[in-house]
Amino acid sequence: MSEIPENSKVSIYSKNEKKARELIQKFSMKPMPGITRVTFRKKNNQIFAIDNPDVYKTQGGNYVVFGEPKVDDFTRRLARAQQQAASAAKDPQSIQADMAAAAAAPAAPAAPAAAPEEDEAGQVDESGLDGQDIELVMQQANVSRNKAVKALREHNSDIVNAIMSLSK
């Protein structure tokens, strides 16, 4: 038997899978191209993933999926991502150097930052607005209460548009 070269697109099927594929052709199931990944979740949040599956759709709307399932463990992925983030973190010396550079920068950019404080100094009329809506806009847009009230007034108490306008 000859060896299959690496990175080739050859699929070797078991006897049962060959029979199942032949039956699918007899039942005239339609192949669904363009699907790159299928995941199945069990009750205990265990996830099975099939990369590059062969997916067929029945006339009734059900799907038949062929491929090699792998157990997808999100806790391992999360641990790996946290390790990468920790390794990418700066050491204390570089943080101190950045802080010193920021302190040595000219004080001119601080003047525009004073303008929003003046805007927040006065009280804004909150009548007609729900306190929970104001709190929600404050949390989501990370702004002061006065800015949240003004945004809600500008957008006729529409929370979504108020948050979007403040997030720009």
Curated annotation (Swiss-Prot):
A molecular function (GO) term: unfolded protein binding
Domain NAC-A/B as annotated: residue spans: 14-78
Listed InterPro entries: EGD2/NACA0like (IPR016641), NAC-like_UBA (IPR044034), NAC_A/B_dom_sf (IPR038187), Nas_poly-pep-assoc_cplx_dom (IPR002715)
Q: Where is there biased composition of kind Low complexity?
A: 100-115
Q: Where is the UBA domain?
A: 129-168
The record's annotation in Pfam families points to: NAC, UBA_HYPK
Q: Where would you find this protein in the cell?
A: Cytoplasm; Nucleus
Under PROSITE patterns, the record lists:
NAC_AB
Q: Does the keyword Zinc apply?
A: no
Question: Which stretches does the entry tag as region Disordered?
Answer: 83-129
The UniProt keyword set, sorted, is: Cytoplasm, Nucleus, Protein transport, Transport
Name the family the entry cites: Belongs to the NAC-alpha family.
What is this protein's function? Component of the nascent polypeptide-associated complex (NAC), a dynamic component of the ribosomal exit tunnel, protecting the emerging polypeptides from interaction with other cytoplasmic proteins to ensure appropriate nascent protein targeting. The NAC complex also promotes mitochondrial protein import by enhancing productive ribosome interactions with the outer mitochondrial membrane and blocks the inappropriate interaction of ribosomes translating non-secretory nascent polypeptides with translocation sites in the membrane of the endoplasmic reticulum.
Q: What do we know about how this protein assembles, alone or with others? A: Part of the nascent polypeptide-associated complex (NAC), consisting of EGD2 and EGD1. NAC associates with ribosomes via EGD1.
Protein name as annotated: Nascent polypeptide-associated complex subunit alpha
